Amino acid sequence: MRTTLALVTAVVLLLVPAEAPAKVRSCHTRADFNLLISSARNMRCKTARRDLRRHHGSISFRFRTPGGFRCRRVSGNALAGQWRCVKQRKAYRFEFSD
């Protein structure tokens, strides 16, 4: 009985589909004259552009967009660099230069 239960459990675990791989898109979309969206994961480039355009605050080391994305600088300095914005499974990267 235990072997049958263990065998059934193993078969069920093998048949459960794995998590779908993340779809990463390469973008070359400008949200503004000094904001270039370079890539987007699990979202369209147009959606990332719209989210970044709705942010009217300063581009600091860390900030949050109105769409709920948490953004953080991953390289560069306050005047030029690359930021990564994340919300659950969605993410995008953008480059800023002043």
Please describe what each predicted stretch is.
Residues K23-N34:
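Short N-terminal segments immediately surrounding and downstream of signal-peptide cleavage
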Residues F33-S38, K46, R50-D98:
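Extracytosolic low-complexity repeat regions of secreted or lipid-anchored proteins
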Residues A6-L15:
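Bacterial N-terminal signal peptides
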Residues A18-A22:
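Sec/Tat signal peptide C-region and signal peptidase I cleavage site
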Residues M1-T4:
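Positively charged n-region of N-terminal signal peptides that target proteins for export
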